């Protein structure tokens, strides 16, 4: 398949090294352009948890003539059998992998010795399996997380824009995306929430089904509440109110959440008692040492809103919302401990689902390999027919030239042409039959013989 992957992730390298190896922004465009000089297509996936280079070893360096002439063999030719094309191909691919590693070290101004212990390498079907596991979220820090598939798609689009996605690599990418979709659809590996922000958003969908008509109140604009707000906004909530001590941070979050179909308002924390009555959903995570929403404030807000249900999510430690609020009818209060308990159960469910997902990945890789072999055989047949036509045309032109000479004997020329055509057409199968007989490969021998007999019967 000629596919190789070289990379680091959260399991193999510390964050300090991952930061130094990250390929982002203009670095990716430059890197893709440079990789094109010695690869038949490449895709770079770089996130906070991984940097990976997916590349195709050039077909030209794996051609039979190039294999034997390659300078890469000089390093290890004494330790391999030059009669083994498999060993030679493996050596060439290893040399190419080393070339990519060296390039990466140079590109990031690091030494190869510095990064090599942390790099992992996969090739051919192992590389395909790895790519599918990554796309399906099976190799993520958070098992089954869906964001990685979107990150890979963006990486592929960037490779397309930079003309770095060859036809074969594009075909492989399509297979990976289709297979990853099947893993997610046919298993439960990504079905349950395993982050606080995602779990909070899941609660919203369980209690409210008419989100465009609902209001979310975000109390404090820190990172955790930002994630919660982003998740709930993505579900289609119609109005968001942000209360924060720092108006600049509140405005920054409002800018992220702003949408023509969504109303966004920024209020001060002092206005919290007044705006609480307008909220169907409250998410609070302030870091304050004091209670921000007590039972009295909640009862007043509930009365003002005619006792319509309220969902309150308290992600703060210490708590922002008085725990006695949970005793009020029509108020659903969830603390960080409540969500952690839900997440713990969901993580275990994902682990169990991952067993099924890994089995499905193995099956899908076998299917992809078969499709690739069929695709490759079609290409090989086309090349074989093209070479055969070239040989026949060459012999025919030589014979025509001889026929135009003085004292040409057409009968002798035609006999010679027939003999040479026969030799050319029977050379490869004859060589294969002798090799099969010499190595005791009766299955291959029977296959070739029966194939030739079928060919004779049909002609």
Swiss-Prot record:
User: Which positions in this protein are listed as binding substrate?
Assistant: 47-50, 140, 145-147, 151
Name the keywords, alphabetized: NADP, Oxidoreductase, Porphyrin biosynthesis
Is-annotated flag, keyword Iron?
Answer: no
- Listed pathway(s): Porphyrin-containing compound metabolism; protoporphyrin-IX biosynthesis; 5-aminolevulinate from L-glutamyl-tRNA(Glu): step 1/2
Q: Which reaction does it catalyse?
A: (S)-4-amino-5-oxopentanoate + tRNA(Glu) + NADP(+) = L-glutamyl-tRNA(Glu) + NADPH + H(+)
Active site: residue positions: 48
Q: Could you tell me which InterPro entries the record lists for this protein?
A: 4pyrrol_synth_GluRdtase (IPR000343), 4pyrrol_synth_GluRdtase_dimer (IPR015896), 4pyrrol_synth_GluRdtase_N (IPR015895), GluRdtase_dimer_dom_sf (IPR036453), GluRdtase_N_sf (IPR036343), NAD(P)-bd_dom_sf (IPR036291), Shikm_DH/Glu-tRNA_Rdtase (IPR006151)
Q: Which GO terms describe its molecular function?
A: glutamyl-tRNA reductase activity; NADP binding
Q: What is its EC number?
A: 1.2.1.70
Q: Name one GO biological process term.
A: protoporphyrinogen IX biosynthetic process from glutamate
* Positions bearing the site annotation: Important for activity: 130
Q: Which domain of life is it from?
A: Bacteria
What EC class does the entry list?
Answer: oxidoreductase
Q: Indicate the secretion signal residues.
A: none
Q: What does this protein do?
A: Catalyzes the NADPH-dependent reduction of glutamyl-tRNA(Glu) to glutamate 1-semialdehyde (GSA).
Give the family, as the similarity comment puts it. Belongs to the glutamyl-tRNA reductase family.
Q: Which PANTHER family match?
A: GLUTAMYL-TRNA REDUCTASE
Q: What else is known?
A: During catalysis, the active site Cys acts as a nucleophile attacking the alpha-carbonyl group of tRNA-bound glutamate with the formation of a thioester intermediate between enzyme and glutamate, and the concomitant release of tRNA(Glu). The thioester intermediate is finally reduced by direct hydride transfer from NADPH, to form the product GSA.
- Self-association state and partner proteins as the record states: Homodimer.
Q: Which NCBIfam families match?
A: hemA
What's the protein name?
Glutamyl-tRNA reductase
Organism expressing this protein natively: Psychrobacter arcticus (strain DSM 17307 / VKM B-2377 / 273-4)
